[in-house]
Curated annotation (Swiss-Prot):
It catalyses: 3-phosphoshikimate + phosphoenolpyruvate = 5-O-(1-carboxyvinyl)-3-phosphoshikimate + phosphate. It comes from Vibrio cholerae serotype O1 (strain ATCC 39315 / El Tor Inaba N16961). The keyword RNA-binding does not apply. Phosphoenolpyruvate binds at residues 22, 96, 124, 172, 345, 387, 412. The keyword Cytoplasm applies. It comes from the Bacteria. This is 3-phosphoshikimate 1-carboxyvinyltransferase. Its main location: cytoplasm.
Length: 426
């Protein structure tokens, strides 16, 4: 297996322009495909998850032109749901942002589809979404394990009416249903059961739907009403924001070993909840400065925090490795959905933090981290999880090297992460 050893870094400083957001890129691609008119998407993320969505759209009859650097894409919208005459199998890798929304969208039109992916995708739950789609008349069957992909979908349209969705495992189930609801056969009301996790990701979905001309009435995240008679219309141009989760590594690095780092492509008006990571970093003692399209972080004396991170679970992973440089014991709470991500992130994070010398308590939905007096050089397993690789790069900000196994797993969202990290390192 390939590995990368990062030597101790004395100082982090400079400027980094973020790649496009994965969450925004795949949502916008799907809505551009369903919309009437041509949409020119700029700052699109070039990564595995986006490639899986683009490949699926090609098979579904969507025409698009991708620039040589793959960050600008002109999508010719269908102006309707997908209609295919031949059975199709769509392989979606480990891309939840493709699997969940496409599973819902393919119920809208006519066609016979199998949705599948990598072995890990077959361990990532989709039952709550399928249950909701079946309430609206969808014909979906599980081909292997109940509640998990692969799925077989017979497109027959989605009925109007009221459905309930369990929001406690993943917000992607609600996102998927919301994006398909305007093309259902009438008014749709979605009622949420349980605590809705990762609410800021729902805000991203609603914001992008609005840019494509669709209104959703949001009753305090407990009920969503999608009025009948709406359709998606291209906004013409669509700029994909920088990925706020990806910003977290550079902001944390500056907080630990700055200098100062300026991250461009996101700012105080970002639609992504993960920019709240900077607030958590500020609570730990970092100095943060906001602009319209940038965030600056500077070093501070870091102290432990005890916080609920249910709203920003992805960026919370970066707090776990930042905690190695903070005084005291840090607790990251209410992050059960780490367990159903690219890997079981609670178990993986606990295992790898212990390797570098931390004392760790792993609970069902929390992790408590006490740093050692000196970090240990360890080979970090990344579990084919891009965020594990990027989080543990921060260990090199100590006086100890760190070895990252399978560093190329960052290709899921940030293929040149380690190059960008090196450019800021002194």
């Amino acid at each position: 297996m390939e590995s990368l050893t990062l030597q101790p870094i004395e100082l982090i400083s400079g400027e980094v322009n973020l790649p496009g957001s994965k969450s925004v890129s795949n949502r916008a691609l799907l809505l551009a495909a369903l919309a009437s008119g041509t949409t020119r998407l700029t700052n699109l993320l070039d990564s595995d998850d986006i490639r899986h969505m683009l490949n699926a759209l090609t098979k579904l009859g969507v025409n698009y032109r991708l620039s040589a650097d793959k960050t600008t894409c002109e999508v010719e919208g269908l102006g309707q749901a997908f209609h295919t005459t031949q059975p199709l199998e769509l392989f979606l890798g480990n891309a939840g942002t493709a699997m969940r929304p496409l599973a819902a969208a393919l119920c809208l039109g006519q066609g016979d589809y199998v949705l599948t992916g990598e072995p890990r995708m077959k361990e990532r739950p989709i039952g709550h979404l399928v249950d909701a789609l079946r309430q609206a008349g969808a014909q979906i069957e599980y081909l292997e394990q109940e509640n998990f992909p692969p799925l077989r979908i017979q497109g027959t349209g989605l009925q109007a009416g009221t459905v309930t969705i369990d929001g406690s495992i993943s917000s992607q189930f609600l996102t998927a249903f919301l994006m398909s609801a305007p093309l259902a056969q009438g008014k749709v009301t979605i009622k949420i059961v349980g605590e809705l996790v990762s609410k800021p990701y729902i805000d991203i979905t609603l914001h992008i739907m609005e840019q494509f001309g669709v209104q959703v009435i949001n009753h305090d995240y407990q009920e969503f009403v999608i009025p009948a008679g709406q359709s998606y219309v291209s906004p013409g141009q669509f700029l994909v924001e920088g990925d706020a989760s990806s910003a977290s590594y550079f902001l944390a690095a500056a907080a630990i070993k700055g200098g100062e780092v300026k991250v461009t492509g996101i700012g105080k008006n970002s639609i992504q909840g993960d920019i709240q990571f900077a607030d958590a970093l500020e609570k730990m003692g970092a100095q943060i400065e906001w602009g319209d399209d940038y965030v600056i972080a500077r070093r501070g004396e870091l102290n432990a925090v005890d916080l609920d991170f249910n709203h920003i679970p992805d960026a919370a992973m970066t707090i776990a490795t930042t905690a190695l440089f903070a005084k005291g014991t840090t607790a990251i709470r209410n992050v059960y959905n780490w367990r159903v991500k690219e890997t079981d992130r609670l178990a993986a994070m606990a295992t790898e933090l212990r390797k570098v010398g931390a004392t760790v308590e792993e609970g069902e939905d929390f992790i408590v981290i006490t740093p050692p007096t000196k970090l240990i050089h360890a080979a970090i397993d990344t579990y084919d999880d891009h965020r594990m690789a990027m989080c543990f790069s921060l260990v090199a900000l100590s006086d100890t090297p760190v070895t990252i196994n399978d560093p190329k797993c960052t290709s899921k969202t940030f293929p040149d992460y380690f190059d960008k990290f090196a450019q800021l390192s002194r």
